[in-house]
Amino acid sequence: VRRVVVTGLGMINAVGHDKESSFKAILDGQCGIERITLFDASRQSVQIAAEVKDFDPTTVMDAREVKKADRFIQLGIKAASEAMVDAGIDESVERERFGVSSASGIGGLANIERNAIICENRGPRRISPFFIPSALVNMLGGFISIEHRLKGPNLSSVTACAAGTHAVSEAAKTIILGGADRMLVVGAEAAICPVGIGGFAAMKALSTRNDEPAKASRPFDAGRDGFIMGEGAGALVLEEYEAAVARGARIYGELIGFGESGDANHITTPAPEGEGAYRAMKAALTMAGNPKVDYINAHGTSTKYNDWYETMAIKKAFGGKENCPPVSSTKGQTAHCLGAAGAIEAVITLMAMRDGIMPPTINYENPDPDCDLDYVPNTPREAKIEVAMSNSFGFGGTNGVLIFKKV
């Protein structure tokens, strides 16, 4: 079986514009959640989010291309460029067997909203010719493949909050089955706009702690009352092991297992007791050969049911509370980046392995009796991490799990 390794990482989110500054901020427990500035949120019931501040897309794109690309694409290009440089990909690396696996939950939602208003108020002839190409989710992969001349498979995952994780597993499958030797994975999201915030708020999915932005996202805490929307992108360069070794690439880790499942339960609520999440974890563990897992980066959204059911699923997958490794959610820092979350958190997980340190679950102040695992509360923890798991679960009952191992 062809082995899949990770050789490059990149990310941008509310606490950092690159992987190193982001990871340091996450370890330091910095929270990127503040009052919304991307639009006037005064009429919204939820007025806080984790925005990427001071982002200049012209640092990674030609100014003429910027107007053709929605913000989620711009963020994705930034993370992808960092990952490619980090992997040491130069002109000598062959491009025909180098593909892209992109992900987003909602794509160009702000663009859709903006052009719908233009259509209603000024007529359809005033719609931007760049509207459709900038709004489609798969255009993230399209822009990136053009930018880096990647001529292998060009895939896209649109599975809500599990999309970034599924983009990794889809890329891995492509390499394992021989469809490519290298895949650039990018998950990106930028849905902080009136209809995005208003839509999630209407579902009662978001925290309404407008007066305490930095305390609003509190995974596994008894006082949690919903997630906070974030934006950003994560990127990983995946390579077939022998191809990576042949060019002398630095390897962050090997993807030794992945698992996917469907809840078939409810459009937004997870399956009772996290049954679907459990099956995804079990599938990943089985594929990986049931290794000892040293750390889990949880989906941990700060919603009542996700955190409760994910805890139950972890305990079932590992055969009881006493066998569970430490678990943390980094969504207290970055908020929930929706379709980008899985890619961002895969990057965080691999950096935790690299540096031998577990990121903390911040804002963990009041233990919930239903959430009774070790959540690495509030302070990072040094530890030898040989094997780590990353979980993502999305609306529609779609679940994805990744397991990485040091090489």
Language-model features and meaning:
Residues 76-85, 140, 167, 239-241, ...:
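Short, well-ordered amphipathic alpha-helical segments that serve as non-catalytic structural scaffolds
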Residues 121-128, 169, 173, 190-246, ...:
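Glycine-/small-residue-rich "gating" segment that lines the acyl/pantetheine channel
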Residues 6, 27-159, 188-199, 293-306:
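Conserved beta-ketoacyl condensing-enzyme motif
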Residues 3-7, 30-34, 211-295:
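Condensing-enzyme catalytic core mediating Claisen C-C bond formation in acyl metabolism
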